[in-house]
Amino acid sequence: MKKIRGLCLPVMLGAVLMSQHVHAADNLTFKGKLIIPACTVQNAEVNWGDIEIQNLVQSGGNQKDFTVDMNCPYSLGTMKVTITSNGQTGNSILVPNTSTASGDGLLIYLYNSNNSGIGNAVTLGSQVTPGKITGTAPARKITLYAKLGYKGNMQSLQAGTFSATATLVASYS
């Protein structure tokens, strides 16, 4: 019996070392991508009606507040908005068909809101946190302000209708 026991250990050890190694390969893959969806922004219009040219203030006057309605399926974290307009930069939109060769023309200045009204200027192409957000998720509403001004010489402005567009994108982060 001692002889069998003595052989048992080397035989078992040899069997373990010589046996094929069984290894389970990863054969299930789980993947996807988590996203935070952008808000769906409704069209908004700011209409100044008739403005007398001589009443324009170069740095911006004729203030109008306006709201932008949106549907935000995700509303955790902080809302950020970005406003762009035909590749323009700075804090104003040069209204098409009102500018001269020297760059003079009608400007629209955009401002954020705060608890007491008008806030800081909005820089086109940069993210900003809206100062006033109302509504309950998913229906949200932000308040912004617009002012009319001009660049250059007031005499270069021509009477007539004007129109400009911009794109607002909103999401939470």
Curated annotation (Swiss-Prot):
Residues 1-24 form the signal peptide. Pfam families: Fimbrial. GO terms for cellular component: extracellular region; pilus. It comes from Escherichia coli. Fimbriae (also called pili), polar filaments radiating from the surface of the bacterium to a length of 0.5-1.5 micrometers and numbering 100-300 per cell, enable bacteria to colonize the epithelium of specific host organs. Keywords: Cell adhesion, Fimbrium, Secreted, Signal. The lineage of its organism: Bacteria, Pseudomonadati, Pseudomonadota, Gammaproteobacteria, Enterobacterales. It is found in: Secreted; Fimbrium. Disulfide bonds: none annotated. This is Fimbrial protein PrsE. GO terms for biological process: cell adhesion involved in single-species biofilm formation. InterPro entries: Adhesion_dom_fimbrial, Adhesion_dom_fimbrial_sf, Adhesion_dom_sf, Bact_Fimbrial_Adh_Pro, P_pili_tip_fibrillum_PapE.
